[in-house]
């Protein structure tokens, strides 16, 4: 069995580039450790499929503006996610396909355009990083996982270890790719806290009828939404607190719609705590 290692130098780290894997750090939320992992796990997994990796292999998540990476050894990569300019040694190359990067060449991922926020880079063999609680995903607030628990910085050195190829590398077909847009229609299942003891019928009608806008103060912990203020079916949270959104601690999931005060938040993979706020389910 031949095992090869690919060394990678981060010439430019980009706005927020981290190492993630899928499905992340599972089973520890009950003790305050969120799963982390990719925000857009479909694009992430498809990047791995393109280069012949298991869907779980560690790769790079790029937010807004991407990195420039020099490969000391020949490697196969794929770039997926939001549309962004991608070049190898200055020559434009497509996303969603396996690409060969020759030794000494530079893969450059530019800034996203008007559609989407995150881009994913997979390298055949997966990005090497030490596992912490069963995952290589970066959790920056906890300062663990990935590259020393932080975003990548200029000058960082990474590596990818390739075993003999056991999966077929392939182009990701157009109908397999997620459709990126500035307007998304989300499927919602009303959860137990959508009951009339918490929200009025008019609140639920507003939830389904409103075109919400994403607030600028959004990140991997959650996507805050701008929309109508709930009327609320009660004046306070009783023993749980003064605001009608307050409830006793309750389990939640990534993608749940949580009302913290009057602000709806789509919960992200790096949220720290069990939220004492009512929520509906989204998918």
Where are these regions (language model features)?
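Conserved "landmark" site that anchors the functional core of diverse proteins
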Residues: 1-275
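Single conserved hydrophobic/aromatic residue that forms the stacking wall/gate
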Residues: 273-283
């Amino acid at each position: 069995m031949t095992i090869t290692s690919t060394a990678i130098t981060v010439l430019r780290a980009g706005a927020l580039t981290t190492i993630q894997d899928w499905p992340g750090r599972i089973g520890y939320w009950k003790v305050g450790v969120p799963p982390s992992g990719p925000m857009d796990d479909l694009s992430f997994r498809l990047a791995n499929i393109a280069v012949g990796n298991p869907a779980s292999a560690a790769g790079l998540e790029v937010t807004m503006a991407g990195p420039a990476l020099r490969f000391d050894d020949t490697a196969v990569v794929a770039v997926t996610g939001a549309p962004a300019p991608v070049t190898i040694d200055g020559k434009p190359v497509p996303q969603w396909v396996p690409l060969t990067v020759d030794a000494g060449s530079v893969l450059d991922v530019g800034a996203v355009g008007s559609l989407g926020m995150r881009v994913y880079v997979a390298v055949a063999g997966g990005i090497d990083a030490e596992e912490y609680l069963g995952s290589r995903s970066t959790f920056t607030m906890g300062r663990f996982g990935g590259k020393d628990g932080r975003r990548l910085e200029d000058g960082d050195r990474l590596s990818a270890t390739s075993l003999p190829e056991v999966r077929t590398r392939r182009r990701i077909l157009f109908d397999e790719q997620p459709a990126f847009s500035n307007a998304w229609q989300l499927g919602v299942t009303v959860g137990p806290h959508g009951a009339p003891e918490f929200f009025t019928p008019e609140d639920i009608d507003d939830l389904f009828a409103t075109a919400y806008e994403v607030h600028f103060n959004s990140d991997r912990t959650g996507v805050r939404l701008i929309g109508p203020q709930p009327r609320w079916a009660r004046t306070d949270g009783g023993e749980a607190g003064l605001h009608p959104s307050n409830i006793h601690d309750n389990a939640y999931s990534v993608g749940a719609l949580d009302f913290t005060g009057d602000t709806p938040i789509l919960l992200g993979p790096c949220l720290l705590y069990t939220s004492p706020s009512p929520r509906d389910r989204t998918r």
